[in-house]
UniProtKB/Swiss-Prot annotation:
Signal peptide: none annotated. NADPH binds at S14, F15, R35, K108, A140, R255, V279, E281. Its main location: cytoplasm. It comes from Pseudomonas putida (strain ATCC 700007 / DSM 6899 / JCM 31910 / BCRC 17059 / LMG 24140 / F1). The lineage of its organism: Bacteria, Pseudomonadati, Pseudomonadota, Gammaproteobacteria, Pseudomonadales. This is Glycerol-3-phosphate dehydrogenase [NAD(P)+]. Its EC number is 1.1.1.94. GO terms for cellular component: cytosol. It is found in: Cytoplasm. GO terms for molecular function: glycerol-3-phosphate dehydrogenase [NAD(P)+] activity; NAD binding. Sn-glycerol 3-phosphate binds at K108, G136, K191, D244, S254, R255, N256. The active site is at K191. One of its GO terms (biological process) is glycerophospholipid biosynthetic process. The keyword Cytoplasm applies. HAMAP family: NAD_Glyc3P_dehydrog.
Length: 341
């Protein structure tokens, strides 16, 4: 990557815009592609993303564009911040242009029909590309406002991790590296489900003990499932696991938390998602995760409970009663029951 070669950011949402700004602040020329030409033009003229990141000035080094072909041709390092439902359809027609390039997924979601993570879809589309993921406790607005933040870039290609660290690491944004791409990406995708539960709990006035129980049991469920899929359990003790889970389950800025809060106030799922105006990946992830957990026989009572409320007509009180009656098992599943080797 030469000094003047632009880095591409695909997606016009809040996180893509925040990352584009970070890159530009580090002196990297950025082309931010979005599907909507009107949005691209408005961002070029007004130097702001009013739809998704209102009040944050778009750095002069970010060029909003609508020509995907030219963007892919011009860039060797490409950050992909597309919704999970759109990633395959947007990039598959341009597979040849991705050959040999560095693709870093920013999307925390799972493809519904295949239960594939975004990096796995990128591998299918561009098997000769180097693939990585970026995930962690990263609320887009706080990043854009320069709150002190840390994230994890994960890839089996160490040089890709170093490349991402070189362009993104800055005075308010620390980038750590990991080789556990699958674990880091699963942490980012799974925690969205539990953020919905946390938002509901706050709206219903549940106590601090309850919220703490939900977050820690959520971490146990996430880790249990991820280990069944081949991830390293220790990854979930870091930024991409417990770090991301805490911020997403605690902050009203989290989209999935907002959906849960609205549900707890008595809104329907359709109303809660519609009012949000952005994609809440947790709703889609919940559906496929419930099915997958049953297939691989992984015990995930919080996932099953939320699914019962949103899609099976159960009430919250019914689900809580069922959860509290369930047999208590081990606290941490990947160590022996006694805690000793």
């Amino acid at each position: 990557m030469t000094e003047q070669q632009p880095v591409a950011v695909l997606g016009g949402g809040s996180f893509g815009t925040a990352v584009a700004n970070l890159l530009a602040e580090n002196g990297v020329p950025v082309r931010q592609w979005m599907r909507d030409p009107a949005q691209a033009e408005a961002m070029r003229v007004n130097r702001e993303n009013p739809r998704y990141l209102k009040g944050i000035r778009l750095h002069d080094g970010v060029e909003p564009v609508n020509d995907l072909l030219a963007t892919l041709q011009a860039s060797e390092l490409i950050f992909v911040a597309l919704p999970s439902s759109a990633l395959r359809s947007v990039l598959a027609p341009h597979a040849e242009l991705l050959r040999g390039k560095a693709l870093v997924s920013l999307t925390k979601g799972i493809e519904a029909q295949s239960f594939k993570l975004m990096s796995q879809i990128l591998e299918e589309i561009a098997p000769e590309a180097r693939i990585g993921v970026l995930s962690g406790p990263n609320l887009a607005r706080e990043i854009a406002e320069h709150a002190l933040t840390a994230t994890v870039v994960a890839s089996e290609h160490e040089d890709l991790c170093q490349q991402v660290q070189a362009v993104l690491h800055g005075r308010t944004f620390r980038v750590y590296a990991s080789a556990d791409r699958f674990g880091v990406e699963l942490g980012g995708a799974l925690k969205n489900v539990y953020a919905i539960i946390a938002g509901m709990a706050v709206a219903l006035g549940m106590g601090e003990n309850t919220k703490s129980m939900l977050i820690t049991r959520a971490l146990a469920e996430m880790t249990r499932f991820a280990v069944s899929q081949g991830a390293n359990p220790m990854t979930f003790l870091g930024l991409a696991g417990v770090g991301d889970l805490i911020v997403t389950c605690s902050s009203p800025k989290s989209r999935n938390y907002q959906v849960g809060y609205a549900l707890g106030q008595g809104q329907s799922l359709e109303e809660a998602v519609s009012r949000l105006g952005e994609v809440a990946e947790g709703v889609n992830t919940l559906k496929v995760l419930k099915t997958k957990a049953q297939q691989v026989q992984v015990y995930m009572p919080l996932v099953a409970g939320l699914h019962a409320i949103l899609f099976e007509g159960r009430t919250l009180n019914q689900v809580i009663e069922h959860l509290m009656r369930a047999e208590p098992k081990t606290d941490v599943d990947f160590i022996s029951i006694s805690g000793f080797n």
